Amino acid sequence: MEPRVVDDPEELRYELWLGADLAGEIRYTREKDGTVVLVHTDVDPSHKGEGLGNVLVQGTLDDLRQRGIGYHVVCPFVARYLARHPQPG
């Protein structure tokens, strides 16, 4: 099944879904100017090692970019991902 990354603004998180199962999330906060601060990434232990954290980060960054929303990173996992996978713009 194809993973889906969706924003849940009420919960302030991006969610990674595999079918009906929530497999991971990136928690965030919002600055007054609308900038998103990516705070923490978590993947369900039953899916560790499957590369879903990377899928979640890239899906989150793609969505933010498509919507024209700036972001800052404090999550170490996202920071490591960005060091290995530079983003456009």
Give a label for each model feature.
Residues 35-44:
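Conserved acetyl-CoA binding element of GNAT-fold acetyltransferases
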Residues 21-29, 37:
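Conserved beta-strand in the GNAT
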Residues 13-23:
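Conserved beta-hairpin
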Residues 55-70:
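Conserved acyl-CoA
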Residues 1-13:
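Active-site rim helix/loop that mediates acceptor-substrate recognition in acyltransferases
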Residues 47, 51-56:
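Conserved acetyl-CoA pyrophosphate-binding loop and the N-cap/start of the following alpha-helix
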Residues 71-76:
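Catalytic nucleophile loop
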